Structure formats: structure tokens, C-alpha cells
């Protein structure tokens, strides 16, 4: 997605080898026009799979996932990292390791929000080692539902997550693929989605 690539090139910042800071438009301050375009692109890519729900992990995946759900006309389910007092029902849960925070979290989804009839599209802001996506896949499987695709805003193609998910048969659509983040330079993968 050319608009996203241009935004990353202009406003993204390499803060360490393998770490890309995009807090000016994606995960701290959010560019609503860009999120709308991202939602439209994910909807265009996945509408044939007829998802009934979009699933993301709090908190940085919420903006692009909400716009995708809006464009698809389906509910958004947000997997939580902590169980709030208001979550009184039984839950689906899985452990997820965060590459950025270097910690393991348990993610949870209230059971009434997913069931075996659901066709779930997973959306997330980043794909690095694939652990967040695999945790969400596990939650969907616990519900007996189907994962119909995985949409990623920014994939770190130099890490194993994309290969891991694709090797398991998942259709993964990444709107921007980063080839490397070394020496303070953002290098994009040659494949560019319009």
C-alpha cells in the first residue's frame, strides 16, 4: 500500500536494530485518514472470505482492526491482556510473547463473543515473530471457529513470523513489508501492494 509505505518512510524511525517506531501515525498518535485507507484495503483483500468477526489484540491493533471491521460491516473483538472486573463469563485464553516489550502476556476473549459459526479475520499492527497472531489463532481455535485470514499493517519480513504463519497455511496479507531495519535505515521488501 503505497500511502502506508510513504508514511513509514517519512515518519517512521528506527530506534534499534529490528525496532521501528511509528507512533506518529499508528500506535500512539493515529492518522484517521490513513486508518480509513488501511481498513478499505483489508476489506478489499478479505471480503471474499466472508468474515463474520475481526479479532485483534489490544491496544495498537485496535485502530486498523476497527476500520477493517467497519468496512466489512462486522463486529470487532479485542483480545484483552488483563481480565477486567466486568468480564464475568468464561474465557478463551492463550499466552503471547511480545517482541517489543520482551514479556509474555495471557490474552483473553470472553466466550460469548466467539463461537463455532464464526469466520474470523485477524488484524494486527505489526508482525515480527508471529507470536501475537498465533495466540489469536489459538483463541479462535478454542472457540471452534475458523481463521479466514490474517491482515498485518507492517510485517518485519526479516523475522520469522510471516514465514511461520504462511507455512501453517494461513493467508497473510501485509500492507507494508520491511526487509531490514539496520544501520538506522528502513528498507522495504520489493513486493509492494498498490
UniProtKB/Swiss-Prot annotation:
GO terms for biological process: purine ribonucleoside salvage; xanthine metabolic process; XMP salvage. CDD domains: PRTases_typeI (cd06223). One of its GO terms (molecular function) is xanthine phosphoribosyltransferase activity. Xanthine binds at residues 20, 27, 156. The keyword Cytoplasm applies. Disulfide bonds: none annotated. Gene3D superfamilies: 3.40.50.2020. One of its GO terms (cellular component) is cytoplasm. Its EC number is 2.4.2.22. Pfam families: Pribosyltran. It is found in: Cytoplasm. Keywords: Cytoplasm, Glycosyltransferase, Purine salvage, Transferase. Pathway: Purine metabolism; XMP biosynthesis via salvage pathway; XMP from xanthine: step 1/1. It is an enzyme of class 2 (transferase). 5-phospho-alpha-D-ribose 1-diphosphate binds at residues 128-132. SUPFAM superfamilies: PRTase-like (SSF53271). It catalyses: XMP + diphosphate = xanthine + 5-phospho-alpha-D-ribose 1-diphosphate. Belongs to the purine/pyrimidine phosphoribosyltransferase family. Xpt subfamily. Converts the preformed base xanthine, a product of nucleic acid breakdown, to xanthosine 5'-monophosphate (XMP), so it can be reused for RNA or DNA synthesis. Homodimer. This is Xanthine phosphoribosyltransferase. It comes from Geobacillus thermodenitrificans (strain NG80-2).
Amino acid at each position: 500500500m503505497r500511502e502506508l509505505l510513504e508514511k513509514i518512510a517519512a515518519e517512521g524511525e528506527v530506534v534499534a536494530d529490528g525496532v521501528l517506531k511509528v507512533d506518529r501515525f499508528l500506535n500512539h498518535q493515529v492518522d484517521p485518514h490513513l486508518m480509513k485507507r488501511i481498513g478499505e484495503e483489508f476489506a478489499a483483500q478479505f471480503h471474499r472470505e466472508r468474515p463474520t468477526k475481526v479479532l485483534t489484540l489490544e491496544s495498537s491493533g485496535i485502530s486498523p482492526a476497527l476500520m477493517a471491521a467497519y468496512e466489512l460491516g462486522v463486529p470487532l473483538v479485542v483480545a484483552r491482556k488483563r481480565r477486567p472486573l466486568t468480564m464475568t463469563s468464561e474465557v478463551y485464553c492463550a499466552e503471547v510473547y511480545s517482541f517489543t516489550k520482551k514479556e509474555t502476556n495471557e490474552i483473553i476473549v470472553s466466550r460469548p463473543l466467539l463461537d463455532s459459526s464464526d469466520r474470523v479475520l485477524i488484524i494486527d499492527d505489526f508482525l515480527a515473530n508471529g507470536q501475537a497472531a498465533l495466540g489469536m489463532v489459538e483463541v479462535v481455535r478454542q472457540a471452534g471457529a475458523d481463521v479466514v485470514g490474517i491482515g498485518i499493517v507492517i510485517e518485519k519480513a526479516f523475522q520469522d513470523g510471516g514465514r511461520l504463519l504462511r507455512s501453517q497455511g494461513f493467508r497473510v496479507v501485509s500492507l507494508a513489508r520491511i526487509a531490514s531495519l539496520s544501520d538506522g535505515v528502513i528498507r522495504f521488501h520489493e513486493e509492494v501492494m498498490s
